[in-house]
Amino acid sequence: MAHYDLLVIGTGPAGQKAAIQAAKLGKKVGIVERKRVVGGVCTNTGTIPSKSLREAALYLSGFHQRSLYGASYRVKQDITMEDLTFRANHVINREIEIIQNQMTRNNVDLWFGTASFIDPHRLRIERADDLVEHTADIVVVACGTVPPRPSHLPFDDHSTTDT
């Protein structure tokens, strides 16, 4: 069991900022992520992927270059979903790499597992192959959100989905 000045639950934007800022102030910091990858919803399924898909579509369709090259200009004639997801995945993977490098550079300990409180200053982290416990003076809970799904809309993940 290690003791930290700050333990953070969640590696999304809020958790990242809390952990990095505390580390920059000389604090001993650890961060826990339930998923097998850092970044939270913003990086992996929300903001960055949706904006990357949008920008890939605009780029491949030649939308921004049409004023220069004419209305029929396209970077690629037939745009496939594979073309779009390739670019989005590249951006996502780069963001994940940046986050991991920030944690390493600032000496933030990172664990993948599910955190639960034993008491206000002690966490149990259930990992794939074991359990560990750590204590902290301060624990920040930054475990993110789930997009709303209004009951009057049929979310079938084909014609209606969320990011």
Outline where the language-model segments fall.
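Beta1/beta-strand and adjacent pyrophosphate-binding region of the FAD-binding site
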Residues: 1-14
